[in-house]
Design a protein with these regions (language model features):
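Thiamine diphosphate
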Residues: 1-178
């Protein structure tokens, strides 16, 4: 029988490369709800004296924090899991109507190799729902594509002022069995 091990997100070098890329593009605010898929990036932000790691009470606070960052002259990113995206949908309308720059990295659940049936509904609804709110989406399935796609998303979100969500698939972050 074929057995696939879950990927260890702590040692995933693609996360370090993406963090470094965000910092090179002057992203200094990292708003997050604790999540295993973003564990490494959150740890980097917490350890970085030139960045601000902002723990959110829930995902709905993310868009408001990013609006505040923009109005204060800073750049930020929201780090959430797909199951929490439903909590921020209404607040995305403020982002799109105000044409605020917005970048969100979403660690996906409910796709490749998912072992928890509770993750399927929102995991499969994230992309169409976020797109319906006027947010562009791009997906990363392979570590070797991470830098190129995130660089595109950064440019689109901040230079083009087109709100963008980067969906980090379970093929990238690792299969979750529970």
């Amino acid at each position: 029988m074929f057995e696939m091990k879950a990927r260890d997100s702590d040692s995933a070098t693609w996360q370090d490369e993406v963090y470094d890329l965000l910092r090179q593009h002057n992203v200094t605010q990292f708003a997050y709800v604790p999540d295993g898929g973003h564990k490494r990036m959150i740890a980097r932000a917490l350890a970085d004296n030139a960045a601000e790691a902002i723990s959110l009470t829930n995902e709905s606070e993310g868009p408001g924090v990013m609006i505040g960052a923009d109005l204060g002259g800073a750049r930020g990113v929201v780090l959430v899991q797909s199951s929490g995206v439903g909590n921020l949908i209404n607040n995305l309308s403020i982002i799109t109507l105000g044409r605020f720059p917005f970048l969100m990295l979403v660690s996906m659940r409910g796709d490749f190799g998912e072992g928890n049936p509770w993750q399927f509904p929102m995991g499969q609804a994230v992309e169409p729902v976020v797109q319906a709110m006027g947010i562009s989406t791009v997906r990363i399935d392979r570590a070797e594509d991470a830098l190129r796609i995130v660089d595109f998303a950064i440019s689109q979100a901040f230079r083009g002022r087109k709100p963008t969500a980067v969906l980090l698939s379970q093929m990238l972050t690792g299969r979750k069995l529970a």
